[in-house]
């Protein structure tokens, strides 16, 4: 009986020493690029949306890791969704701990419609100058969007995720020239 107990303890020690699954608990890091495209709100010349945070959730108590915007010092990134109809641009990119991820969270902090003129410059930047003419600020009751999709960030690897911000479904007119946004964002692909 004593031999069985000793062998059981020895077997448990050997199993513990072998460590866990390297995919779930890697020691390195990899790169995640989050790209954005759109099918925008059709009645405007520009739809400027400011994102204040992008995070990725790592499986198994890994918690959330913040994904920097294109410029690592930027605290937000603004995109003119009208310019992203037939193209895509970078929302965030950075190094994350390698591992298995289950969710990306995107926070929209502000949005505005511009009816008379398109915006100048790139589709996405730290700031975009507001176009001239008539505009409407969009109320955003809850700007946090949780995108549940499993993906892996490999050690020394690169993962790219493309999201589609559906401007038509996200923006509704509430009357008296007022607008409300409930962000509708889907994941198109993960590579």
Where would I find each of the regions flagged by the language model?
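A short, solvent-exposed, low-complexity linear motif enriched for acidic/polar residues
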Residues: 19-191
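Residue-level signal for mature regions of secreted extracellular proteins and peptides
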Residues: 11-12, 72
